């Protein structure tokens, strides 16, 4: 199970791996991407510098299997980076940075099927593809083609090229080494971590058009310093790994900051969400940690008199709830007894 030293302070349910890198089963050398197989209760971890994928049980973190080895031939990996599971087509998709291609593996058999792409900037060419995501509603595969500073859209039916968007820059729908991509299926959106622009961009998954962005460089709540991984939870909240600020941050689907998780973690790189179990997995220090999403977001949300007043807009669901909040704040203010951190124990009522 590895080093569980964070459990006491961070409510981490389980940890996989050790701080020391290695090549044994259950040990990593640069875990670079995560994907939950929600139907089988498995967590797939891309073990980048070991050029393989390891598979673990979501129940206890025990090692289940592995596949892949270093090389340039089909079915071999050269610094794999991103991973996505396409349940509709029994498919695992994996991007390779140094082979500049995308591999397709059977999900049920964990066996190689095919690969596409080579280095370049053409329709089916890539330059350091970092991540991959599945847009199940529009039957598309979306590749974060990092050094080409673009998103490439493929058909998930036959993995054919559809179109691409983006170029290098800092304007809307421009990128500077985008790291990872996630899909908000309910709102038909693509969420992209724009690493060197220190922001997250939100695009339409229908045509790739720009919708809005959030984040700016800094270490205040809601600011980012090289955002890398991201995922969407079952309430539409956007979870971002804030690499140089050594924390995870949660935002509403509108991009408003909710909460931060920074209890002793260092250099978090990627994050994934298990919608069936309500779990968030993230990587740091050659380990994979798993926490409860709802517990983190409820337990760490605080109202701070020295910052923004009241609760974020997503909490304002009923008139009675807001009346209760305002009444509580007004009463405490009148008595001059507002504590530094007033915990809102009202999540069970929302």
Q: What kind of region is each of these model predictions?
A:
Residues 36-40, 85-89, 134-138, 183-187, ...:
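Residue-level detector of Asp-centered blade-edge/turn motifs that repeat once per structural unit
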Residues 43-44, 91-93, 140-142, 190-191, ...:
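Conserved beta-propeller blade signature
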Residues 58-60, 106-110, 155-158, 205-207, ...:
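Short loop/turn segments that connect beta-strands within beta-propeller blades
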Residues 267-300:
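Blade-level signature of beta-propeller repeat domains, shared across WD40, Kelch, NHL, RCC1
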Residues 295-350:
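Cullin-RING E3 adaptor/co-adaptor recruitment helices
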